[in-house]
A protein has these predicted regions:
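Terminal beta-strand-rich extracellular "head" domains
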Residues: 32-45, 56-138, 142-171
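Glycine-rich, low-complexity segments
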Residues: 1-38, 171
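Intrinsic disorder/low-complexity segments
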Residues: 3-5, 13-16, 20, 49, ...
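Extended, low-complexity regulatory regions
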Residues: 51-53
Length: 171
């Protein structure tokens, strides 16, 4: 017998039967990196970025955990002196062609008395979302970006390595 009173014989072979089950079990995972360079967005409507990945759920009851990390630089500028300005970059997640989440924004602001200057904010924006797509067909998730310039002008730049991870979990 491989199992004694209190010891497990580690040199023996064991066979386990049955399936691992239960909510939260990871069924599959997709991961993608994107090297972004010189991507500049000045549109006040959402524009698709290159950050995308897709997954085909194995059951309609599955949950998809989406995690994304995006390098964002928001620049606000004013071409005439003596003005305050402010710009904000917005990042949204789309499932296929439908906006799914829009809860992340970063802003740059400043004040100048010179002929041209700018204020900015930069960093990595990181999020996790839990989705219930209720399908066994392929589902594509994509990051969209837009600018809102409340005063002056501005732009959102994506520069650096972005990533997106999709994890199907049993519900």
């Amino acid at each position: 017998d491989a199992v004694g009173n209190t010891k497990l014989d580690l040199s023996a072979n064991y066979a386990f039967t049955g399936a691992i089950s239960g909510a939260g079990r990871v069924l599959q995972q997709q991961f993608a990196n994107f090297n972004l360079s010189g991507v500049s967005i000045t549109s006040t409507s959402y524009v698709a970025s290159a950050i995308t990945d897709s997954i085909t759920p194995s059951a309609t009851s599955s949950k998809i955990m989406i995690t994304a990390q995006v390098p964002v630089f928001v620049k606000a500028s004013q071409s005439s002196g003596g003005a305050n300005w402010f710009a904000r970059g917005h990042i949204a997640l789309y499932r296929d062609s439908t906006q799914f989440i829009d809860n992340t924004s970063m802003g740059g602001s400043g004040y100048t008395t010179s002929s041209y200057n700018y204020g900015h904010v930069e960093g990595y924006a990181t999020w996790s979302w839990l989705d219930s797509p209720s399908t066994t067909s392929a589902v594509a998730y994509k990051i969209y970006v837009k600018l809102s310039a409340l005063q002056g002008t501005g732009q959102v730049e994506l520069n650096g390595v972005a990533s997106i991870s999709l994890m199907e979990m049993q519900n």
